[in-house]
């Protein structure tokens, strides 16, 4: 789609050429980056992305990484950033730039699960998610494979439950199973038991245009079975931005959100009053933007970025000039 086709009557979603990028960066202190589909695909860095972030750091820009992926701790994400050449801090400061949904879910539960009994969560998710929860004092059960017990529904419902579970947390879980779903619903029959989803992404992009089902598919399954609506931590929820803002002291008008998804990254930026850049190396396309611009739905009209780039490497000329 040509540049002329991308911009709407309101001047949003224009190609961020070198001249526009220089003007934008002059008014910006902080850049918030999504990771999957923006900085890398799977285990491969987007060409030119490491050099772009190195140049931004050299210009004195503050960087933070906001990911809906709950499969790694902050420290593990920092290690991946370093291994792929993005220059994240090491040592005691490792992970301080990273705001993943595992970490932010832990902050949320620490706020909500006050008082006795001691906080405990049934976790449909990764070891990393459980590690972040346990780091703030929330004990975890349920991580890992959980096959069906018995030979029918009666036996499944008789499977023992842990006492005093105060939250069901749904993240990315390759071991998601009918047994786990059944247990989650049983815990959620207690009205005071929280249902928390790390994010609602429907798919996770990998290399060569491939993708896998995202966490949102699992959250929806639990919501439907339990007839409950989950509290969502990740983008576009404002909670994850508030986590960054509290630690970084962000001024929204001098902050840019860079992402590849209109319904998470760009919507978060618009909702929080940030400047927004869509990169076309991930999920959303200019065709999606145009569809939103032409929609009669006001919610879709909000999911339009200020600028777009083919890749964040398109920022390099402005940084080298």
From Swiss-Prot:
Membrane spanning stretches: none
Catalysed reaction, written as an equation: O-phospho-L-tyrosyl-[protein] + H2O = L-tyrosyl-[protein] + phosphate; sn-glycerol 1-phosphate + H2O = glycerol + phosphate; sn-glycerol 3-phosphate + H2O = glycerol + phosphate
Enzyme Commission (EC) number: 3.1.3.21, 3.1.3.48
Sequence positions that bind Mg(2+): 34, 36, 260
GO MF annotation: an example: magnesium ion binding
UniProt keywords, alphabetically: Carbohydrate metabolism, Hydrolase, Magnesium, Metal-binding, Protein phosphatase
Pfam families tied to this protein: Hydrolase_6, Hydrolase_like
Site (Important for substrate specificity): 204
Gene Ontology cellular component terms for the protein in this record: cytoplasm
Active-site residue list: 34 (nucleophile), 36 (proton donor)
InterPro entries in UniProt: HAD-like_sf, HAD-SF_hydro_IIA, HAD_sf, PGP_euk
One BP annotation, GO: glycerophospholipid metabolic process
Named cofactor requirement(s): Mg(2+)
Free-text remark on how the cofactor is bound: Binds 1 Mg(2+) ion per subunit.
Assembly and interaction partners: Homodimer.
Protein name: Glycerol-3-phosphate phosphatase
